[in-house]
C-alpha cells in the first residue's frame, strides 16, 4: 500500500488567435506578426478570469497543503509565464512562493505546450534547454526532471 503521494500539475494558459485572421504584411517584424495573429485583448480577458477563478484559489490551496507536508510537482508553460509577467505579477509572486517551498519540485515542460518533438527533435531539445534557463530566470530554480506535452514521448 502506498504511504506517500505526489501530485503533479501543469500551469498553462494558451494564447488565442484573432478571428477573422488578419493578413500579415510583407516585411512584417515579429511584433507586427504577433499583433496580426494573436488577440491580446481576449488573451488578457481570459487570463484574468482564469486567474481569479482558478490560479489564485489553487495556489492558496497548494501553499496550505505543502506547508502541511504534502509534496507537489508543478510545471509551467512559457506561454503562462509571459502572460503572468505582463498581466498579474502578484499571481506570479504567489507561484514563486509556492515553487520556493522545499516540498515543491519544479518540472520542466515544453515551453509552449505543443508537439514540436514530432516535427523537429533538435529544435525540441534546444527549446527544452531554453525552458530550463527561463524557469531559472523566473523562479531561481532549474528543473531536474521534465515532462513532454501530454506525456507523449
Regions found by a protein language model. Give the residues of each.
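Catalytic alpha-helical scaffold of carbohydrate-active enzymes acting on polysaccharides/glycoconjugates
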Residues: 1-144, 151-153
